[in-house]
Swiss-Prot record:
Annotated metabolic or biological route of this protein: Isoprenoid biosynthesis; isopentenyl diphosphate biosynthesis via DXP pathway; isopentenyl diphosphate from 1-deoxy-D-xylulose 5-phosphate: step 1/6
EC number: 1.1.1.267
Species of the source: Serratia proteamaculans (strain 568)
Protein name (record): 1-deoxy-D-xylulose 5-phosphate reductoisomerase
Gene from which the chain derives: dxr
Residues annotated for Mn(2+) binding in this entry: 150, 152, 231
């Protein structure tokens, strides 16, 4: 039986991971849960799964959780803070760590799991978008097995030879007969919206994703295709891919989650119902398979699968991300930080939908930054980029 620590247990990926555990109680047990400040959900999770440890982001939330668990007779030891999260990610008797804390808060706990040699199920985008080289070097040094949880990266992983799966980030695609990785994206809710209407698009319209159920921030990222841009950056690191070995295409049905082209003309693809439990179950049980609880794909109901090329004028954020990777880690870090500020401002109706790309581009252009050599340097770039982005948002809002 695998012992699990889940970093970010109350979020979308965390709750989906626990749903897979619920389907397979004879294969997985929860050793530790880590979350932010959602005490109510964490209490329910502790009552159901009885972890030995739980950690909250701060002492106030931890105190509330202790009271709730004591009232229910649950003996889980409750901790608080980033150091506690790092300790629970590196526990001796933990086999697998799900890294699903969103944002910079997930960097150090994820790195702690890698350095402890755990099998790491990676959902934290920032680990690779802002710290790709640092993280992949740590993976190689610790001989950790990294398993991607994003549906697209998991699809690519499943479509690659086992020899690459076992040496993620350091194998040569070319020497294994791989010619290109094809990253698919739905194109979001504005795929067919006339461009002249973009300035009038509202947060609610941007968050109405046609296929996936997601949080508001990532829904906006889907509408701008910044999410695909960030996934492109992650894929370059995860699969040691050059720009020439990457391809991004629109696939509105979200059934093919990504593909791999081989030199002999073959294309391997992973298909499935759009549900995060599928890639999570695959990674949790790898190299075996377990029940995820997901409904089987009905090909007759789908009818047809279509593809198109993403237009630059419709999806400028996608191309900003592609160009940022070639500019370096400082640029991808700055872009990610700027985008978080811009999307938050759009969701609060402080700027227009089209301003998101404008803010992102100006931040990357204005900052003159050195390549980061440690996480502190990454966090400083992140801070500077946010500062500039906030100033730009204010100038647009006034």
């Amino acid at each position: 039986m695998k012992q699990l620590t889940i970093l970010g247990s109350t979020g979308s990926v965390g709750t989906s991971t626990l749903a897979v555990v619920r389907e397979n109680p004879d294969r997985f047990a929860i050793k530790a849960l880590v979350a932010g400040r959602n005490v109510a959900v964490m209490a329910q999770q502790c009552i159901e799964f009885r972890p030995a440890y739980a950690a909250m982001a701060d002492e106030g939330a931890a105190r509330e959780l202790r009271i709730l668990l004591a009232e229910n007779g649950i003996a889980t030891e409750v901790m608080a803070g980033e150091q506690a999260a790092c300790e629970l990610a590196a526990l001796d008797d933990v086999d697998q760590v799900t890294a699903a804390i969103v944002g910079a808060a997930g960097l150090l706990p994820t790195l702690a799991a890698i350095r402890a040699g755990k099998q790491v199920l990676l959902a934290n985008k920032e680990s690779l978008v802002t710290c790709g080289r640092l993280f992949m070097d740590a993976v190689q040094q610790s001989k950790t097995q990294l398993l991607p949880l994003d549906s697209e990266h998991n699809a690519i992983f499943q479509s690659l030879p086992e020899s690459i799966q076992r040496q993620l980030g350091y194998s040569s695609l070319e020497s294994h007969g791989v010619s290109r990785i094809v990253l698919t994206g739905s194109g979001g809710p504005f795929r067919t919206t006339p461009l002249e209407q973009f300035t009038a698009m509202t947060p609610d319209q941007a968050c109405a994703h046609p296929n996936w159920s997601m949080g508001r921030k990532i829904s906006v990222d889907s509408a701008t295709m910044m999410n695909k841009g960030l996934e492109y950056i992650e894929a370059r690191w995860l699969f040691n891919a050059s720009a020439e070995q990457m391809e991004v295409i629109l696939h509105p049905q979200s059934v093919i989650h990504s593909m791999v082209r081989y030199t002999d003309g073959s294309v391997l693809a992973q298909l499935g119902t759009p549900d995060m439990r599928t890639p999570i179950a695959h990674a949790m049980a790898y190299p075996q398979r377990v029940n995820s609880g997901v409904e089987a794909l009905d090909f007759c109901r789908i009818g047809s699968l279509t593809f198109a090329e993403p237009e630059r004028e419709r999806y400028p954020c996608l191309y900003l991300a592609i160009e940022a990777f070639d500019a370096g880690q400082a640029a991808t870090t700055a872009l990610n930080a700027a985008n978080e500020v811009a999307v938050a401002a759009f969701l609060q109706e402080q700027i227009r939908f089209t301003d998101i790309a404008a803010v992102n581009q100006k931040v990357v252009e204005r900052l003159s930054l050195q390549e980061p050599s440690c996480i502190d340097a990454v966090l400083e770039i992140d801070r500077q980029a946010r500062e500039v982005a906030v100033g730009l948002v204010k100038s647009l809002h006034n």
